[in-house]
UniProtKB/Swiss-Prot annotation:
Enzyme class: oxidoreductase
Protein name per Swiss-Prot or TrEMBL: L-2-hydroxyglutarate dehydrogenase
Gene responsible for this protein: lhgO
Family statement drawn from the similarity comment of this UniProt entry: Belongs to the L2HGDH family.
The keyword Electron transport is annotated on this UniProt entry: yes
Length: 422
C-alpha cells in the first residue's frame, strides 16, 4: 500500500510529487500517468509564458500564486539549468475602448504589486517598431520557458529521491473506503493508497465522480489553435505582445509569443473542442460531445457567448479571419506568414449555473485532494500550487483517525516553498 498516490503527470502533478517527497521523505509515493512521458497534455501544449500576474483579481489564488510562481519558476530553472528568457510582456491597445480597459489593467497591476511602465503610441513604436497601437503597458517580469522541460526536471527530482512514476497507467475506477482509496487502471492493475491526490487536468471532474462525489462543476474543453510565423519573422518582436483582453471573456486573446527556441508563435484562439483531448479539428468523441451539450451550465455559457463563440469558430476555419485579429497590432503579417503549429486544449471548469469558474479550485473527500480548475496561469503557478496541495494533504492526514502508517513531516511546506523563491 502506498502512502500517497498522485494521478496526473502534468506540471501540477509533478510539482506536487516533488514537494510531497521533500516533506515526507520516508513515504511510499507513486505518480500515475496514462501517457509514456510527463507533460503530454496541457503542460506541453501551451504558450510557455512565465506570467507576471497582470490580469488576476487582487487577493485571489491566481494573483497570489502567479506572483510567487513567477519567481519560483525562474529560481527552479536556475537550479536545474533550464533555459528561460525574461523578455517582458507588452500589452497593446488599438482602440479607445481598449485604452479604457488598459487603464483598468494599469490599476490592477498596481494592486497586484507589479513593476510596469505606461507607454504612449510613440514610445510603444520605439520599443516595438513592427507593432502599432494607441498605447501600451510594459511588464518586465514576464518571460518564456519550456514547461515540458520544467515538468521533466521535476519528475527527475522526484524519482531521484525515491518516488515512483508509473507510466501507461490510465485510471478506470476509484473506490474510497475508511482506510484509503483503491485505484484500478485500464491495464488491469490495482493499487491502494492511504491518500489520493488528483491532478488530472482535462479529466479532473471525471476523477472526482469516480469516487461517487458530485464535483459541482464540469470540465469544458476549449481548443487553442496556434500558428508559427515564418522563420524570417523570428525577430519581428522584442517582447511578448498581447492584446487588451475583453474582461467578459475568460481568455487573453491571440498574441505573439517569442518561444524559447527562437521562433515566434501566434495564438491561441478558443474553440469548443468536441473531444476532451481533441487537438485536431477532426477529433470528435460522441461521448464527450454528448456530455458537453447535456450540461445545462455549458449550454448557458455557449448561449451567453454565442456571437464570440461563432467568431472563434469562423476564424478557426478561415485563416484570413484569424490573421485579421493579429493584424490589428502587427499589420505587416500576411496569410503566407502563418505556418501550422500544434494546438492545445484548455480545461475550463463550468458551474451548473453557467459560470466560468475563474479561480483555482480544489475539492476534497475524506481520503483525497483534487485540483479541479487550473487554467492559466497554472503552469507559472505550479510550484506554489504544489505547495498549497501539500499543505492540504498535511491537514487531511491530521484529520484522519487512521491515516495509515505514521509519517513524520521532515519539512514545513512554507519552508519548502521558500527554497524556490530565494
Amino acid at each position: 500500500m502506498y502512502d500517497f498516490v498522485i494521478i496526473g503527470g502534468g506540471i501540477i502533478g509533478m510539482s506536487t510529487a516533488m514537494q510531497l517527497i521533500d516533506v515526507y521523505p520516508d513515504a511510499r509515493i507513486a505518480l500515475l500517468e496514462k501517457e509514456s512521458a510527463p507533460a503530454c497534455h496541457q503542460t506541453g501544449h501551451n504558450s510557455g509564458v512565465i506570467h507576471a500576474g497582470v490580469y488576476y483579481t487582487p487577493g485571489s489564488l491566481k494573483a497570489r500564486f502567479c506572483l510567487a510562481g513567477n519567481l519560483a519558476t525562474k529560481t527552479f530553472c536556475d537550479q536545474n539549468n533550464i533555459r528561460y528568457d525574461t523578455c517582458g510582456k507588452m500589452l497593446v491597445a488599438t482602440s479607445e475602448l481598449e485604452m479604457a480597459r488598459m487603464r483598468a489593467l494599469w490599476e490592477r497591476t498596481a494592486a497586484n504589486g507589479l513593476e510596469r511602465e505606461w507607454l504612449s503610441a510613440a514610445e510603444l513604436r520605439e520599443r516595438e517598431p513592427n507593432i502599432i497601437g494607441l498605447g501600451g503597458i510594459f511588464v518586465p517580469s514576464s518571460g518564456i520557458v519550456s514547461y515540458r522541460d520544467v515538468a521533466t526536471a521535476m519528475a527527475n527530482r522526484f524519482q531521484a529521491k525515491g518516488g515512483e512514476i508509473i507510466y501507461h497507467a490510465e485510471v478506470s475506477a476509484l473506490t474510497e473506503h475508511a482506510a484509503g482509496v483503491v485505484i484500478r487502471t485500464s491495464q488491469g492493475r490495482e493499487i491502494e493508497t492511504a491518500t489520493l491526490i488528483g491532478c488530472a487536468g482535462l479529466m479532473a471532474d471525471r476523477l472526482v465522480k469516480m469516487l461517487g462525489v458530485e464535483p459541482g462543476f464540469i470540465i469544458c474543453p476549449f481548443r487553442g489553435e496556434y500558428f508559427r510565423l515564418a522563420p524570417r519573422h523570428n525577430r519581428i518582436v522584442n517582447h511578448l505582445i498581447y492584446p487588451i483582453p475583453d474582461p467578459a471573456m475568460p481568455f487573453l486573446g491571440v498574441h505573439l509569443t517569442r518561444m524559447i527556441d527562437g521562433s515566434v508563435t501566434v495564438g491561441p484562439n478558443a474553440v469548443l473542442a468536441l473531444k476532451r483531448e481533441g487537438y485536431r479539428k477532426r477529433d470528435v468523441s460522441f461521448t464527450d460531445t454528448l456530455e458537453v451539450f447535456r450540461s445545462a451550465g455549458i449550454r448557458r455559457v455557449l448561449k451567453n457567448h454565442l456571437l464570440s463563440g461563432l467568431g472563434e469558430m469562423k476564424n478557426s476555419l478561415c485563416k484570413s479571419g484569424y490573421l485579421r485579429r493579429v493584424q490589428k497590432y502587427c499589420p505587416s503579417l500576411t496569410v503566407n506568414d502563418l505556418q501550422p503549429w500544434p494546438a492545445g486544449v484548455r480545461a475550463q471548469a463550468v458551474s451548473p449555473d453557467g459560470k466560468l469558474i475563474d479561480d483555482f479550485l480544489f475539492v476534497a473527500t475524506p481520503r483525497s485532494i483534487h485540483t479541479c480548475n487550473a487554467p492559466s496561469p497554472a503552469a507559472t503557478s505550479a510550484i506554489p500550487i504544489g505547495a498549497h496541495i501539500v499543505s492540504k494533504v498535511q491537514a487531511l492526514r491530521e484529520s484522519q483517525s487512521n491515516p495509515g502508517r505514521t509519517l513524520r513531516a521532515a519539512r514545513n511546506v512554507d519552508t519548502l516553498h521558500a527554497a524556490f523563491t530565494r
